[in-house]
Amino acid sequence: MLIPSKLSRPVRLDHTVVRERLLAKLSGANNFRLALITSPAGYGKTTLISQWAAGKNDIGWYSLDEGDNQQERFASYLIAAVQQATNGHCAICETMAQKRQYASLTSLFAQLFIELAEWHSPLYLVIDDYHLITNPVIHESMRFFIRHQPENLTLVVLSRNLPQLGIANLRVRDQLLEIGSQQLAFTHQEAKQFFDCRLSSPIEAAESSWICDDVSGWATALQLIALSARQNTHSAHKSARRLAGINASHLSDYLVDEVLDNVDLATRHFLLKSAILRSMNDALITRVTGEENGQMRLEEIERQGLFLQRMDDTGEWFCYHPLFGNFLRQRCQWELAAELPEIHRAAAESWMAQGFPSEAIHHALAAGDALMLRDILLNHAWSLFNHSELSLLEESLKALPWDSLLENPQLVLLQAWLMQSQHRYGEVNTLLARAEHEIKDIREGTMHAEFNALRAQVAINDGNPDEAERLAKLALEELPPGWFYSRIVATSVLGEVLHCKGELTRSLALMQQTEQMARQHDVWHYALWSLIQQSEILFAQGFLQTAWETQEKTFQLINEQHLEQLPMHEFLVRIRAQLLWAWARLDEAEASARSGIEVLSSYQPQQQLQCLAMLIQCSLARGDLDNARSQLNRLENLLGNGKYHSDWISNANKVRVIYWQMTGDKAAAANWLRHTAKPEFANNHFLQGQWRNIARAQILLGEFEPAEIVLEELNENARSLRLMSDLNRNLLLLNQLYWQAGRKSDAQRVLLDALKLANRTGFISHFVIEGEAMAQQLRQLIQLNTLPELEQHRAQRILREINQHHRHKFAHFDENFVERLLNHPEVPELIHTSPLTQREWQVLGLIYSGYSNEQIAGELEVAATTIKTHIRNLYQKLGVAHRQAAVQHAQKLLKMMGYGV
């Protein structure tokens, strides 16, 4: 729940001097990306901007305090301020901020700018007291904000110091409007206006000018002088002499003498007690100070000029001027030290009564009241956890003694979930084991079941499915029906365990059950996870169309609940990319993989490994080996700098081995084969994939017998577990083994099986990557004209894709390739003495790829007669007499350059 006063622009007070010269400068603020108002405390920054903002509608105001260094809190308030300015235009961002469904502040801001693209009016966002921000992540995010904000948005920042927002760059590009302390300082005329409003009897212009000069136009000093002159008999001149040369850091003595010592004791105590509140209203004041009419007392303090200011138009919320508020809080610690814990307790109770547990926790911590803090957490901690107030919860739990946690195991569970959310798996088990050791009877009943549900989640995350299964079953046996969250967790874990064991039908049923429960109780991240798992299971079963439809349902959930920036969104777009790749929709597959990388842009690069492998698969299917090699360099660097799940390693190895196959790199394959993991089982698609990688490497090395043993065992497991997509892949690899071993009839038999199974899976690209050997077999089958209609149609489609694949695979004669070729030490002398034109190199590449003259003419969009001329010229330059000789010559050049052809 957001505190309204933090989003309210300060009310323009009576008796303030209208800063016409500065307002004139600010009138052009809409021409700048950033308006920066900087000065020490008390120069009137907030008052000036509140004057400028008066009458503007498209403006959001965000007043910071120390607690806004928490990223989630900063995001919530900033988006709320934008919503205030746009009348709720950015609904998606608002939901994402409220539910903490974003990967980082920068990704949230990126979504904000997408929504603001449809907002065409001038828009202003004011952030007051930015000097309170010390979190470097927020600074970096705000630099991103300024770089990418829409042209019609102006950010207005008020700060006591120069903020870390890339100011120099903005200044150079003339995108910065600056107002500093010298401009904020009162002029003689403004000082005279000020005193005329504040003093019962006017002072001479010369005297007000002298006072103004003596305090360098510092507004707070002028206000103190006027207050002192009203409260005492001595002149403003005398007060000015005392203030001359004093700055904000040396005001304490003056404020004691001239303010606190000149009010009655009741007012003094009111000021000191109320100052502990960062913002205050009638109910808070009544509870904290004991005054019966808090609103009336606040208005009275305001009339006395005691540095109290209204925070909203309703007059409900107030706060002290920051300078005066800090002074009062320090004095409160000295003068009311014995009462201070009780004052903070009263503040916490009042904030709780108004529904602001975060503020209540702030005061409970300040009071050092562990019992109060415990009670607040017992009632509100899980709500705060679900809203990602993780830093606040961690600080709160650390403040509680261990005995208090033991007396309230729910808080131990909360602390463990905090650790789990931060991937501190070892600490989770240590904490729960310690708690179980010290809490009587914890090993039985509901709490133990909740512990086990969490332990099960930790175990599956840590790659221990057997332990996860045991714990999840125990949890489900002991959990009452109403304990929905832990039941969702345990059911999801059990479904994932069965998935790992290859028991796909049972796993699918449990994931569907998880989805149903998660939707019922609005646990959206588990609903999303269960749908992704369902899609992956259906893919493994060979039901790719149903997997597609499940993915469509998942995308709908993401859009409805604004889950776009959860890391799980990357998982979804990645498995969508895998499906599109299987169907040879390569452009769409690549776009999906790139969108997955974008989702993970604010995470460690290692997290992008899977999507990068998918991009390499797309390059391989297109035959773009140069691009694949470039991407593989990055993938291998990531592999060497991270710890990954076996599924991730299997997918990374897959593209490496296929690349080695396409380039004939037997040395790399042999080296990998010596060191790679050889799983004990092959009962899921992760392990099947790794064993298939091993078999592919063995085939490349001519080790046909061990490869056949591997593939036959994989097929046996795949058939028994109904891993139909894996069976389809295995058959294709077995086909390649038989073909290369000269067992043509066996090769044809398994190819026919693979084509038949592809009617169910829809596979295309899995055939295509096997290249020319596959093309030869398909041509033979098509010529025999014995294939059933569906298989015939698929074979023709695959053949078309292979032709395109080989064109790209071998048409390397672009400018970069030719330049490298000409610089190669072994290049034939004839190439130097009779150089080919770039067009002739292109024609040679297409001849090698098997294109007829008519196809080459169509590809290059020239007349057939022109192509004949090019061919005649390149034959003459290469010293060849016919097409086959040209093909052999091109093949020699490619082999010389390291391409396995």
Swiss-Prot record:
<dbReference type="InterPro" id="IPR011990">
    <property type="entry name" value="TPR-like_helical_dom_sf"/>
</dbReference>
<comment type="similarity">
    <text>Belongs to the MalT family.</text>
</comment>
<dbReference type="Pfam" id="PF17874">
    <property type="entry name" value="TPR_MalT"/>
</dbReference>
<dbReference type="Pfam" id="PF00196">
    <property type="entry name" value="GerE"/>
</dbReference>
<keyword id="KW-0805">Transcription regulation</keyword>
<comment type="subunit">
    <text>Monomer in solution. Oligomerizes to an active state in the presence of the positive effectors ATP and maltotriose.</text>
</comment>
<feature type="domain" description="HTH luxR-type">
    <location>
        <begin position="829"/>
        <end position="894"/>
    </location>
</feature>
<dbReference type="GO" id="GO:0003700">
    <property type="term" value="F:DNA-binding transcription factor activity"/>
</dbReference>
<keyword id="KW-0547">Nucleotide-binding</keyword>
<dbReference type="InterPro" id="IPR016032">
    <property type="entry name" value="Sig_transdc_resp-reg_C-effctor"/>
</dbReference>
<dbReference type="InterPro" id="IPR041617">
    <property type="entry name" value="TPR_MalT"/>
</dbReference>
<dbReference type="GO" id="GO:0003677">
    <property type="term" value="F:DNA binding"/>
</dbReference>
<dbReference type="InterPro" id="IPR000792">
    <property type="entry name" value="Tscrpt_reg_LuxR_C"/>
</dbReference>
<keyword id="KW-0067">ATP-binding</keyword>
<dbReference type="InterPro" id="IPR036388">
    <property type="entry name" value="WH-like_DNA-bd_sf"/>
</dbReference>
<dbReference type="GO" id="GO:0005524">
    <property type="term" value="F:ATP binding"/>
</dbReference>
<keyword id="KW-0238">DNA-binding</keyword>
<keyword id="KW-0804">Transcription</keyword>
<dbReference type="GO" id="GO:0045893">
    <property type="term" value="P:positive regulation of DNA-templated transcription"/>
</dbReference>
<dbReference type="GO" id="GO:0045913">
    <property type="term" value="P:positive regulation of carbohydrate metabolic process"/>
</dbReference>
<protein>
    <recommendedName>
        <fullName>HTH-type transcriptional regulator MalT</fullName>
    </recommendedName>
</protein>
<keyword id="KW-0119">Carbohydrate metabolism</keyword>
<feature type="DNA-binding region" description="H-T-H motif">
    <location>
        <begin position="853"/>
        <end position="872"/>
    </location>
</feature>
<feature type="binding site">
    <location>
        <begin position="39"/>
        <end position="46"/>
    </location>
    <ligand>
        <name>ATP</name>
    </ligand>
</feature>
<dbReference type="InterPro" id="IPR023768">
    <property type="entry name" value="Tscrpt_reg_HTH_MalT"/>
</dbReference>
<comment type="function">
    <text>Positively regulates the transcription of the maltose regulon whose gene products are responsible for uptake and catabolism of malto-oligosaccharides. Specifically binds to the promoter region of its target genes, recognizing a short DNA motif called the MalT box.</text>
</comment>
<keyword id="KW-0010">Activator</keyword>
<dbReference type="InterPro" id="IPR027417">
    <property type="entry name" value="P-loop_NTPase"/>
</dbReference>
